[in-house]
A protein has these predicted regions:
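Alpha-helical interaction elements in eukaryotic regulators
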Residues: 40-44, 246, 250, 270, ...
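A conserved beta-strand-loop-helix scaffold within acyl/acetyltransferase catalytic domains
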Residues: 4-6, 56-70, 78-83, 88-335, ...
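Eukaryote-specific, cytoplasm-facing alpha-helical/coiled-coil scaffolding segments in long proteins
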Residues: 73-75, 280-282, 402-407
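Short amphipathic alpha-helical interaction elements and helix-loop-helix interfaces
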Residues: 54, 260-264, 352-356, 384-387
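A residue-level signal for conserved active-site and pocket-lining positions in enzyme catalytic cores
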Residues: 48, 254, 378
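Noncatalytic N-terminal accessory/assembly modules of large enzymes
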Residues: 1-50, 58-61, 66, 80, ...
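Aromatic (often tryptophan-rich) hydrophobic motifs at membrane interfaces
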Residues: 302-385
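Active-site/acyl-donor-binding loops of N-acyltransferases
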Residues: 356-420
Length: 477
C-alpha cells in the first residue's frame, strides 16, 4: 500500500466464556475468541477474514468452530463467474418494474400492505421520518371461492387470475416460439411466391447469450418512470460532507429497520449503538496505484429512492474482495427483497472494481451457517466457497454441503495431508507493542516481570497465523 508505514494494533481477549446464540437461542452455546482493534490495515483484515475472523464495529472475533453451537463458515462468491439464477432475475425484474411503474409486489408472507415512499415525511430541520398510521395496513384475507364441480357447464363461471390454467382455452405457448413460427411461415410464403418449394428447412436457431447481471441492473427505463433509484458510495468518515449530510437520515432508517424487522427496543438501536456498530471501523482508509479509484476501507452504499434513503449496505473494500458487513432498509419496502437485491448490486460492484484492481475479484457474504436454515440463502450465490476451519483453504460449497448435512462441524478439506500453510512456527517473532515501543515477543518476554503470558500469546498467534503475528502489534501493558 502507498503511504507511510501503518500498523494494526489489537488487544486480545481470549475466549471460552459462552454467550447467548442469536441463531439457535442457546444461552451459553456461542463460543468465540475475540480482540479489540484500535486500528487495522486493510491487508491485515483481508488475511484475518481468510482465517475465519470477522469484525463487528471494532471488535474482531473468530468462532471456536469445533465447540460453538452454530459453526460459522466464512463464505465467498466468485464475482466474475457469477450468473444470476432464476430467482435472482425475478428479484431484479421486480425492482425494475417498481421503478418503472411504481407497483409494489403484493401477497407477501408478512401479510402487510406496504405503503409507498410518498407516505413518508422528512422535515428539513429535524430530519425525523414519520409514516402513515399502521392501522388499516393489515390486508384482508381473500374470501374462499367455491368452484363448481362441472366448471365447463356453468355459463356464469369465469376463469380468473390465480385459479390455474383455463381449460376452455388452448395451452399457452412461449412468445418466442410463436414469433419463430410466424417468421418461418412468412419465409415459406415468400419462397412459394417466387416459385421455390414451400418446404423450407428451418434455419438452425442461433445461440443467444443469456442476459448477465449488469444487463438487468442497467436496463433502460421509460422517460416517465414512476421512481428514480440512485446508488451512492459514501466513505465512513465524519469529515466527508456526503456522509455527514446523510448521517441523521441513516440513523433513523437503521432504528426503524431494527425495531420492525428484529423487534429491538428503541434503546437497542440508539444513535450511539448505530455509530458503534456500523460507523466505528478499525480499517484505515488506504489507496494504492493498482487499487480502486476510491481506495480501500469501510463504506456505506446508500440506495436513494426519489431523493430519500431507503436502504444502506455497509461494506468493506479490501485488496481481494468486497466484504458485506450489514444491510438495513425501510421495512415498507421489504417485498422488494432488498437483502437479495443489494447483494446482487454488491456483486456487480465487485466486478466493476475488479476492472480497476485485478486482484479484487471476490464477494464475501460473511458467515454461512448451515445449521440455521435462514442463513442458507448465502449459498445461492454460485460459484462460492467455504473456508475450511482447519487448513484455511477454500472448498467449493457443493463439496461441503454433504459433510454439513452429517455434522454441524466438519473439516471441509478432505485431503488428509493438507495443513495450515500459515500456521504458527515461532511465537518469539510475533510483534508486541509495549510502552509505545515495537518489539518481537521474545525480546518483550525477557524484559517482562511477573507471571508468564506466553500461553495467551501463543494462542493469539496461532489463531492469526505466523504472517499476521509478525505484522500486527499485540498490545502488552
Amino acid at each position: 500500500m502507498a503511504g507511510s508505514k501503518s500498523y494494526t494494533i489489537v488487544e486480545y481477549f481470549g475466549g471460552g466464556d459462552g454467550y447467548r446464540c442469536g441463531y439457535c437461542k442457546n444461552d451459553k452455546g456461542n463460543l468465540s475468541h475475540g480482540m479489540w482493534s484500535h486500528t487495522m490495515t486493510v491487508q491485515d483484515y483481508q488475511d484475518l477474514i481468510d482465517r475465519g475472523w470477522r469484525r463487528s464495529g471494532k471488535y474482531v472475533y473468530k468462532p471456536i468452530m469445533n465447540k460453538t453451537c452454530c459453526p460459522q463458515y466464512t463464505i465467498r462468491c466468485h464475482a466474475l463467474k457469477f450468473q444470476p439464477s432464476k430467482s435472482h432475475k425475478k428479484i431484479l425484474k421486480k425492482m425494475s418494474k417498481f421503478i418503472s411503474k411504481g407497483e409494489l409486489p403484493k401477497g407477501q408472507s408478512d401479510g402487510k400492505l406496504l405503503v409507498s415512499l410518498y407516505g413518508l415525511t422528512v422535515h428539513p430541520q429535524s430530519q425525523n421520518i414519520t409514516t402513515t398510521d399502521k392501522e388499516g395496513m393489515e390486508r384482508g384475507k381473500w374470501g374462499e371461492i367455491d368452484c363448481p364441480t362441472q366448471k365447463t357447464q356453468n355459463p356464469f363461471f369465469f376463469w380468473g387470475p390465480g385459479m390455474g390454467a383455463d381449460p376452455s382455452r388452448a395451452p399457452c405457448r412461449k412468445a418466442k416460439d410463436l414469433r419463430k413460427e410466424r417468421r418461418l411461415q412468412k419465409e415459406q410464403m415468400r419462397q412459394h411466391a417466387e416459385g421455390v418449394s414451400s418446404i423450407v428447412s428451418p434455419t438452425p436457431p442461433q445461440m443467444t447469450q443469456p442476459k448477465g447481471l449488469e444487463d438487468f441492473i442497467n436496463q433502460s427505463l421509460p422517460e416517465n418512470a414512476a421512481h428514480s433509484l440512485e446508488v451512492r458510495l459514501v466513505p465512513v468518515d465524519f469529515e466527508d460532507p456526503q456522509f455527514t449530510a446523510s448521517y441523521q437520515q441513516s440513523v433513523e432508517l437503521y432504528a426503524r429497520y431494527q425495531m420492525a424487522i428484529h423487534g429491538d427496543d428503541p434503546s437497542e438501536c440508539s444513535e450511539s449503538e448505530f455509530r458503534r456498530f456500523l460507523c466505528d471501523s478499525p480499517l484505515e482508509a488506504e489507496s494504492s496505484p493498482d487499487g480502486p479509484e476510491m481506495g480501500y476501507g469501510s463504506f456505506h452504499q446508500q440506495y436513494w429512492l426519489d431523493g430519500r434513503i431507503v436502504a444502506v449496505g455497509v461494506i468493506d473494500v479490501l485488496p481481494n474482495c468486497v466484504s458485506s458487513v450489514y444491510l438495513y432498509y425501510h421495512p415498507d419496502f421489504a417485498s422488494l427483497s432488498l437483502g437479495s437485491y443489494s447483494a446482487l448490486r454488491e456483486i456487480a460492484f465487485t466486478r466493476q472494481l475488479q476492472k480497476q484492481s485485478p486482484k479484487l475479484c471476490y464477494y464475501y457474504l460473511g458467515f454461512y451457517i448451515h445449521s440455521c436454515p435462514k442463513m442458507r440463502y448465502k449459498g445461492q450465490y454460485r460459484p462460492s466457497d467455504l473456508l475450511c476451519p482447519e487448513t484455511y483453504m477454500w472448498v467449493p460449497i457443493e463439496r461441503c454441503i454433504p459433510q454439513l448435512e452429517d455434522s454441524r462441524y466438519a473439516r471441509l478439506n478432505q485431503d488428509p495431508d493438507a495443513g495450515d500453510c500459515r500456521a504458527l512456527k515461532e511465537v518469539g517473532r510475533a510483534l508486541v507493542l509495549h510502552r509505545r515501543a515495537v518489539m518481537p515477543y521474545a525480546a518483550y518476554a525477557r524484559k517482562r516481570r511477573g507471571s508468564s503470558d506466553e500461553t495467551e500469546v501463543q494462542q493469539y498467534a496461532s489463531l492469526v497465523g505466523q504472517d499476521c503475528a509478525e505484522r500486527i502489534l499485540l498490545y502488552r501493558a
